[in-house]
Amino acid sequence: MIDKLKIALIPGDGIGMEVMPEGVRVLEAAASKYNLSLDWQEFDWSCETYLKTGAMMPEDGMDQLRPCDAVYLGAVGFPTVADHVSLWGLLIPIRREFDQYVNLRPVRLFDGIPCPLANKKPGDIDFYVCLLYTSPSPRDS
């Protein structure tokens, strides 16, 4: 049984930087419940990094991530950086290197949260959107 996990933390940009500390708190609480220790290694890879260095991550970025047990990635994107830069400079390389092809997004209406859909209540909206990244890209040829 693994009692210590090494996790790569990539907050990214904008909302990623805002929500990741809370996500870390949640994961730390869950880990303590199961007597796990989390060893966080933070990487400053973002669109702001791209603006400073010309790259979303260093050339040896995958080598830096490989020893980790998991990658916890926030959000990337910046008004002055084209979306394809963060996509092909960070997200796609990580997904491909570590065979991460499923993006699972739960959609659930919680009690006490206003809903713009008429007459919907908790339990009426409860499903998952599953995006599979399996098709080759034009950049693969």
Feature locations, PLM:
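Conserved small/polar residues in nucleotide/adenosyl-binding loops
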Residues: Y133-D140
